[in-house]
Amino acid sequence: MSKLKLSSTNATAWCGISQHSLMDLPWVQELHFTHLKIAITIDRMFPVMPSGPIPAQPGDTLYLSNLDDMIGARVFTPTIYFYEPAADMNSSQKPVMKILCDSLAEVLVAYYPLSGRLRETKNGKLEVFFGLNQGVLMVEAHSKMALADLGDLTVPNPGWEPLIFKFPDEEPYKVLDMPLVIAQVTLFSCGGFSLGLRLCHCICDGLGAMQLFRAWAATAKAGTKIAKPEPCWEREIFLPRNPPLVKFPHVEFMSIEDGSSLTMTLWQTKPVQKCYRLSQEFQSHLKTLAQPDDVCTTFDAMAAHIWRSWVKALDVRPLDYELRLTFSVNARQKLHNPPLKEGFYGNVVCVACATSTVSELVNGQISDTTRVVREARLNVSEEYLRSTVDYIEAVRPKRLEFGGKLTITQWTRFSIYESADFGWGRPVYAGPIDLTPTPQVCVILPAGKADQHGTVVVCICLPEDAIDKFTEYLCMMDSSNASHI
């Protein structure tokens, strides 16, 4: 692992502190993962059904809102959780598979929609339907390797892919007639284990997934069902208006002709996943520099800085081409008519979209880009959400649009480590593993269970010949020449 520090000249120029103290401060670390092949044996696969009666019979259906049915939600979100061998004798003797399966079956009584399947109606809209022999898919596997053989477990590694189950020859983005939750438990020779999950985004957003996961983990740990808050389905709260009333342009969904060099640069070779650890001090100073006029959030400043660094590293042309930055905004607290019920676990996110020309990103100031990001975030209101629902109803976009776009996803607002203690302690790592299938996506992750200082990990995919430039721009901070950052 190589530590990247701001140059003493740049750092001193705007921080106003001594060169000596900064030279010892690892504000940005470039993280490296071990290239490995994990050999596993799948021992068995079986459905996990709700352990008690549920309010649905074969043939019943459940409504999904247009927020659940957005084209970007028609995916499975893969995550991996690593648990080290238990230190105490009582925990080490707990049967992992039995506890995880029994507790999941208990939780599925309250979260019964997850035991169904998705299908399309005549107009192409998704719904949940219930049939015989459905349930959640559980996969039990083992490996002769130990967790120590997997390299640094704090850095997302594409080599962990065998630990998250996929069907042979599975079609990309397939969600129809699939189990809505797929869980693979892999037992390692050292006594540790991993839990690889694929959860259908149509059923819940990130906060909804954490609610489900928290209930599962708490039930496993306590040995009795715990589902607080009581889960609430009620997707009809987001019914479209009749007729649909679209009040915003919703450029986040629109197809824009890519008249730039961006797509060719990104896709001409297989992208490489890179991760960087950014300290809380780096984020704080970046936020201070980014808001001379406006009050911004740390995310506003970070998103602006990453976007600018990405565009500069890729040397996008022409300079007058307009680029888009999209990111999800949680709209739960913006809903008042009516407010959401506690326990609602469906999708309540809107896609915010900031736009700026290449020239403005490359030659402008960090404060200008931050302001654009902030305005896009604040533009998400209750009416914006209702307009999004109506836009999807009227247009029903069929494909993801990547033209001129970078998407940043923030996982730091999820209590992903705190929610995942099944009785063996918090996971040593919790999060995604491989971003290379989507090279126009950047993910900001919490640094890990051991970090208590606000450190984040930024993961992004880049062409190999752009990595050094991106690393340089990401680390650069100089108030005397704001166009440098």
PLM-predicted stretches and their roles:
Residues I38-I42, M49-D60, A73-R74, P78-R413:
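Soluble acyl-CoA-dependent acyltransferase catalytic core bearing the H(X)4D motif
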Residues Q57-N66, F422-Y429:
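Short, polar loop/linker segments at the starts of domains and inter-domain junctions
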Residues G403-S483:
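Low-complexity, glycine/alanine/valine/leucine- and proline-rich hydrophobic stretches
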Residues A217-T224, M476-I485:
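A common structural junction motif
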Residues C15-G16, V351, V443, I460:
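Secreted/luminal cysteine- and crosslink-motif detector
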Residues S2-S18, L22-Y63, I99:
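Cytosolic, low-complexity regulatory segments enriched in Ser/Pro/Gly with interspersed Lys/Arg
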Residues A13-W14, H201, V441:
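The N-terminal extracellular segments of secreted preproproteins, especially immediately downstream
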